[in-house]
Amino acid sequence: MLRITLKKGREGPVLRGHPWIFSGAIEQIEGGADAAGVADVFDCENHWIARGLLSPKSQIRVRILTWQKEEIDGDFFSRRISRSLSLRESILSRATDAYRIANGEGDFLPGLIVDRYNEFLVCQFLTAGMHCLKSVVVGSLSNLLAAKGIFEKSEGRVLDEEGIQPSVGVLAGEPPPELITIEENGFKFVIDVRRGQKTGFFLDQRDNRAILTTIARDKKILNCFSYSGAFSIYALGGGAKEIVSLDSSRPALELAERNLALNGFEVGGSELLKGDAFTYLKECDGAFRLRPLD
């Protein structure tokens, strides 16, 4: 296992629970300064502090996994993922089968994103250290969840900073279909995990969409950067008078059109508009009572 020794006086943030160690705090790396993987962290007096993941090319050199001397293996990931899954299941509506299972540092799994879309999982391994543990994570997910397939979509600028290559493809089970149908708070959506934005859907906006339903009645609404039309559909479900869904991407608007139909909303009750949101906002004056911006 890699061993990291901190400079004198730099152990404080880690001892207080900070999940990151920056490169400037490190005195020495033993076992391979250019290697990524699991590393033990010690202070300058050789006291063990924590166990984390080393990213040799990142300014955030270490991301802490645990402050306990526990093995970083399949059982470790099974425990962490089970805990995060239990938290979600305790608050989610039964009419929801799409949500984030693992949210990086928020679930003490730095560099790992796992999103559930109905019977499929989409993963992102966004740090060099977590990338090294890909097979272990996939094994834990396969054992815990009866997913039809596990798909990887690791891409974006953050990978350049970590010194790892983008990776997109099937990790286990079946490949996802071209479009997956999901349900969120009773509304249905088709999503494209391969070509869509992020992992296929903006799961982090679920609560904001639900709030919009409660304030949309009889209002004229401009949904900027509308993508697959999720805010528009929630607004129509809340009784909105009129919706304009604005996006610069034609494929996104086509996806929104399908989702409107899937939820029983006639396209005639809303307008799908291709254009630049910033330009349109300057020109529309006070025509819209609500303007979701995501």
Where are these predicted regions, by residue range?
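Rossmann-like S-adenosyl-L-methionine
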Residues: 174-294
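A short interface-forming secondary-structure element
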Residues: 118-130
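Non-catalytic accessory regions of SAM-dependent methyltransferases
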Residues: 1-118
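A short, charged
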Residues: 75-79, 83-89, 95, 146-163, ...
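Short amphipathic alpha-helical segments
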Residues: 73-80, 129, 133-137
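Extended active-site and interfacial segments that coordinate phosphate-rich ligands
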Residues: 57-63, 128-135, 141
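Non-catalytic substrate-recognition/targeting regions of SAM-dependent transferases
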Residues: 102-109, 113-115, 132-202
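Short hydrophobic-aromatic micro-motifs
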Residues: 21-22, 41, 50, 121-124, ...
